[in-house]
Amino acid sequence: LIVSTLLLSFTNSLAQEERPRARDIGLEIGIFETGALNAITDVTGVRVGHETVIEGDDIRSGATAIIPAPGNLYTNPIPAWIHIGNGYGKMIGETQVREFGEIETPIILTCTLCVWSAASALKDWMYQQPGMGEHTLNPIVGETNDSRVNNMWADPIGHDEVFAALNNASSGPVAEGSVGAGTGTQAFGWKGGIGTSSRVLPEELGGYTVGVLVQTNFGGVLNMNGAPVGRELANYSFRDYVIPKGSDSDREDGSIMIVVATDAPLTARNLDRVGMRAIMGLARTG
């Protein structure tokens, strides 16, 4: 299980099948107002792009790119931190971020066994950017395991897919659900994928924006605003042990990547604190 939160601070098209978001059906989470898009792209400068790969009977995966700031991130790195909630994963680039407290590339999310090819592609993309010389580079790539529906051993995500996600990145609405790195993932025993939201603090508290993007792939007992939805629908982790009805479920397994961005002027030390609170927010979902 990997639960990683990547925090950033600095001063596309819709999914194939458009579905209502939580607030569209009257489910309002929290007390603060959302940004205009209710997405991580409400934080000025943040762009998100997806590339979805569906091939044959066994490839269901993709890449999601988060570009956290305009310009060349290598020559103009921004404060960042990676907070690990549970460290069973194959993330690339963590140690340097935790040493220097800054990020120098975009972030790529993909499937577990694609992280190395994705990191190589991100490296190649960075060296094509204006102002890059011959330097070492610390690509940031996170992952979740989508092997229930995806043959990740075929290494379906590489140069072309990562380049497409990066080059398609925009500051507009963010496609959610079975798209990009969320194509083959699940949550709480149902289909999961990519999700995003944002909140804006009142002017008296600085007026800052906080945006989140997640790649879900985990189990639990789904709660929506405190309502025990998973329990009521009898679809939750460890159900087969509590109410024996066979062993056809693996809802207790999984992972999640959480990317948090803000325009609040926070240091890497305080971004770590934000990451801890993001894990608390995850716990509230069940």
Please name every model-derived segment:
Residues 1-9:
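Bacterial N-terminal signal peptides
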Residues 11-15:
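Sec/Tat signal peptide C-region and signal peptidase I cleavage site
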Residues 16-286:
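Alpha/propeptide regions of enzymes that mature by internal proteolysis
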